[in-house]
Design a protein with these regions (language model features):
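Alpha-helix boundary/capping residues
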Residues: 37, 58, 82, 185, ...
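Hydrophobic alpha-helical segments
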Residues: 12, 60, 84, 193, ...
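RNase H-like nuclease fold core
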Residues: 1-61
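Acidic/histidine-rich catalytic cores and adjacent linkers
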Residues: 41-48, 52, 93-207
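Generic recognition of cysteine residues
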Residues: 6, 10-11, 22, 67, ...
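Short, surface-exposed linear patches
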Residues: 16-18, 29-33, 40, 65-68, ...
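Conserved beta-strand -> loop -> alpha-helix junction used to position metal-binding or nucleic-acid-contacting
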Residues: 42, 46-49, 53-95
Length: 207
């Protein structure tokens, strides 16, 4: 709801399980919402601010699957869809490949590709520059941030939970269920009623 409020939503395959209104997304708000819901076996998240911290505190045994589409989008935000460097083009392609992984072997190969990319371009990534304030900083800072976003997810072991054969349930690789279903309908409704006050918009979402 723009900068005025945020509505956190949890759902399963068929129903909305709960929602919580807050000023902005943060771990305490997620904690309040998660405590209202029975702990699941696995949860899919877009990686919103504070969610993983709340998950570790409230749903101790639940496994986390990070939405692969959001992981790719995070890299794309830094590299753009038309990277201007060879390293950028390669990393964009590696991130895009996330959306095509269907086996453990493919996942292992993908992680190896990320690490190989890092080694292959280590000299390029170590280049420094001086900004307008005279501060020395990495010349390819955005590319490094893109790489770090993937490495962090690899280290957190939350990219390929959907391939875990020990799970007794089906785990999707993305959160399309809530984004393409619930959130898309809510955004469409709010676009069609832009003149409503923030209070009425919140009530409309709840309705």
């Amino acid at each position: 709801l723009a900068r005025n409020a945020c509505i956190l939503i949890c759902c399963n395959e068929t129903h909305v399980l709960g929602w919580y209104v807050c000023r902005y997304e943060h771990s305490k708000a997620w904690e309040v919402l998660l405590r209202r819901i029975s702990p699941p076996t696995v949860v899919v998240s877009d990686g919103g601010t504070g969610f993983q911290k709340a998950l570790k505190k409230v749903w101790l045994k639940a496994k986390l699957q990070r939405c692969l589409f959001y992981a790719f989008q995070q890299v794309k935000r830094y590299t753009t869809i038309r990277p201007k460097t060879i390293a950028g083009c390669e990393l964009y392609g590696i991130a895009r490949d996330l959306l095509t992984i269907h086996t453990q072997d493919h996942a292992v190969k993908w992680v190896q590709n990320v690490m190989s990319w890092k080694v292959r371009h280590r000299v390029f990534l170590s280049e420094m520059t001086v900004d307008e304030n005279g501060t020395i900083r990495p010349k390819h800072e955005r590319l490094i941030k893109a790489e770090n976003s993937l490495v962090k997810l690899i280290n957190n072991r939350c990219l390929f939970t959907y391939l875990d054969t020990s799970l007794r349930c089906t785990c999707p690789a993305t959160n399309n269920r809530i984004e393409g279903g619930i959130n898309a309908q809510l955004r469409a409704m709010l676009r069609n009623h832009r003149g409503m006050s923030i209070e009425r918009r919140i009530k409309a979402v709840f309705w």
